Amino acid sequence: MSISIRPDEISSIIQQQIEQYDQEVKVANVGTVLQVGDGIARIYGLEKAMAGELLEFEDGTVGIAQNLEEDNVGAVLMGEGREIQEGSTVTATGRIAQIGVGEALIGRVVDALGRAIDGKGDIKASESRLIESPAPGIIARRSVHEPMQTGITAIDSMIPIGRGQRELIIGDRQTGKTAIAIDTIINQKGEDVVCVYVAIGQKASTVANVVQTLQEKGAMDYTVVVAAGASEPATLQFLAPYTGATIAEYFMYKGKATLVIYDDLSKQAQAYRQMSLLLRRPPGREAYPGDVFYIHSRLLERAAKLSDELGKGSMTALPIIETQAGDVSAYIPTNVISITDGQIFLSSDLFNAGIRPAVNPGISVSRVGSAAQTKAMKKVAGKIKLELAQFDDLQAFAQFASDLDKATQDQLARGQRLRELLKQSQNQPLSVAEQVAILYAGINGYLDDIPVDKVTTFTKGLRDYLKSGVNPYFQDVQSKKTLGDDEEKALKAALDDYKKTFKATA
């Protein structure tokens, strides 16, 4: 008996099988490791890799595609990568580096990828943001007009900083750069400002000290610490500042004021130089790659004061740069000076002479901050920079001149007292009312008959006297931030009263 198969039956069976076929075809962009070492991997394949794309290695290590060359891809590793070998498989993820952000980050210490490193458990992020985000455009911004008080009299009076400004802190090692940044964070208590402190390439013990100081002062309640220590791969040290900016950006677009400190960008540039040289990119001046300016400009341009339509948020950036023997004309210092809206220059000579904070008012400048200075401070601080500059000139001249006229002697005496009252202890920021009172006393001659070595005692006593509430001045200036006729009259009365008691007890 012959079996006859009809063609239409065959076609219907095939059609049925085709319709039931549901196996998914997975297309993956895969490559093979050609060479690995020093935190760099060269990979064959990955034809469709994007610049900056995250790559996943066999052992779970993540890398970033940096060099897209004709026959291979150069990638930097974001981990030790000890298990990666020649011939290992690499898969392109199709994603760009991003981190989790949200309120849960406040009070925590995280690494450059936003992972908790403080032993307090995982962080439940509310959303993800790209580490490399575009900076706000021209229309999205408005000019800097609100003060960002550092609590340091020398800075708030002569080099004022506004919300949304980029102000560089520059100086040799051990001149108090980090101390100024930490004081500024401590001074934001009660101001509804979210602070982000980014430690790049620092010793773990140094970062632990900073966190401890912030905890003791109650500042970790509004601060996030991003740490990429000296033992971390260069890739993470390079990424850490962008992570800090991304965390601050989340709060900025929610309408909050934020403050980011990058401590310090010299080490970030060195990490980028290391990555670039190992990737065989051509070196330029001081062996830095040609785009080292761009890594800092795209970071610092993300700091802004947003327009009213975007919620009035702000990101103030205080980048720190370390100089070698006071040389501000080196490559990285000049780059960052040209990007920022001013610089606070700390001098090792002043520091060693006991003038702390060691701010050099001669070459320090704030290009936009004066528009943000409080009215009370503007009224008293106008003359101080000029007086100190003239004092420096006279002091140099007085070393050679034996007989000085009375006016010159008086000006020298006034200058010495002004310099003395600008001295301030670490981790003790002052309120606006305290700063205004001290400066007013110095400029209007209340200290002229006080011995130079007693000026610090006088100013401390004056601050305590004003805060005791005997006089209405302190509360009025603290709330209004102006120094009107009534406040000035109250301040004069307070100064006269306190000076009498000080002279009687001295």
Swiss-Prot record:
Site (Required for activity): S364
Principal cellular location given in the protein's record: membrane
GO molecular function, one term: proton-transporting ATP synthase activity, rotational mechanism
PROSITE patterns: ATPASE_ALPHA_BETA
Coiled coil feature spans: none
One Pfam family cited in the UniProt record for this chain: ATP-synt_ab
Catalytically driven reaction(s): ATP + H2O + 4 H(+)(in) = ADP + phosphate + 5 H(+)(out)
CDD domains xrefs: ATP-synt_F1_alpha_C (cd18113), ATP-synt_F1_alpha_N (cd18116), F1-ATPase_alpha_CD (cd01132)
Binding of ATP, residues: G171, D172, R173, Q174, T175, G176, K177, T178
Enzyme class: translocase
Assigned keywords, A-Z: ATP synthesis, ATP-binding, CF(1), Hydrogen ion transport, Ion transport, Membrane, Nucleotide-binding, Thylakoid, Translocase, Transport
Membrane topology: Peripheral membrane protein
Any single Gene Ontology cellular-component annotation: proton-transporting ATP synthase complex
Compartments it resides in: Cellular thylakoid membrane
EC number assigned by the record: 7.1.2.2
Family matches, as HAMAP family: ATP_synth_alpha_bact
Biological role stated in the UniProt entry: Produces ATP from ADP in the presence of a proton gradient across the membrane. The alpha chain is a regulatory subunit.
The protein's assembly and partners: F-type ATPases have 2 components, CF(1) - the catalytic core - and CF(0) - the membrane proton channel. CF(1) has five subunits: alpha(3), beta(3), gamma(1), delta(1), epsilon(1). CF(0) has four main subunits: a(1), b(1), b'(1) and c(9-12).
Record-stated family: Belongs to the ATPase alpha/beta chains family.
Protein name: ATP synthase subunit alpha
Gene giving rise to this polypeptide: atpA
